[in-house]
Amino acid sequence: MLRWFEEGGNNSDVVISSRVRLARNINGYNFSYKMSDTDAKKLVKNVTDQLKTISPISGYNSYNFDYLDAYQKMGMRERHVISPYLEKQDYAAGFVAPDEDVSIMINEEDHIRIQAFAAGMNMQKAYTLADKMDDVIGDVLDYSYDQKFGYLTTLPSNAGTGMRASYMLHLPALAGNDKISGLIPEVGRFGLVLKAMEGDNNKALGDIYQLTNLVTLGKSEKDIIDNLDNIAEQIIAQERNYRKQYITKRKMTALDMVYRSYGVLKYARKVTLNDGELLLSQIRFGLASGLIKADGFDESNIYQLMIGIHPANLLMISNKDMNEEELEVSRADFIREHLPTIH
């Protein structure tokens, strides 16, 4: 079965994924940050026991932090199956769909976080997946809900719908033209946040950024998605425009950049994470812009590589501890093994 990020999607030249995350708490428990270890264990066990027998969750893969090592947790976080916050929790559990498009986290910043992904720009699909799962879970758990304030959440900014919607965007042209710092305050005027998925906002790792809503209280799910879509479409148009300008004015330079990136990755024997992500970003740009072609391989496959070269994945493949140099050698081997032939 293909995982969600192995599929193509709308506007996939710029939009890697659509994600909806719902924050929910359960009556009878303190918020997660106030819970004792005893109560945290009780929450994890009780919720897990209640959810594991119901459809469709009974067909999901389950996990419990009692039985995972640090590398396994890190690998799940690298694939966005769990959040950085959950990774640091001592007591946590959850369920993941076989294709990893739906994930249920227990004892995150809120008692339950439901997240759903769709490839490319398809927020409605992600929302439908999350909403259906929310209904299933809400049938067996007593959510904390107030008629005036909506779903009660640990952070007041999440109250109301409890929904955060976000797009993961590949923005090499905007980043390369130093336009990200100007976009951040602009999207902020519309209640949105634009930030690097990893690294510095001015130069994100792999040129990958997240656009997400900041305000949920007083907004319907449709309001949130419509506002996000409107701004995302403007950013997509700007990114495409800068790509077109670059290729029109400096096509040989663009081709040279893409082929150099390919050549380095094809023959390098050591690759750092930063270099690997940068060079793969440039190849993704080349594929998405039509500068190069690879049979049976497109920009979505490049994103698989961008996930695959993170440390935990390499450590799990090797099944042994590695120092930094050994990781760089393993990363170069992994890239050479999966890099397609281009023309």
Question: What function would you assign to each model-found segment?
Answer:
Residues 1-148, 163, 175-177, 182-184, ...:
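Long, Pro/Ser/Thr-rich low-complexity/intrinsically disordered regulatory tracts in eukaryotic proteins
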Residues 150-168:
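Conserved phosphate/anionic-ligand binding catalytic regions in large, soluble enzymes, centered on
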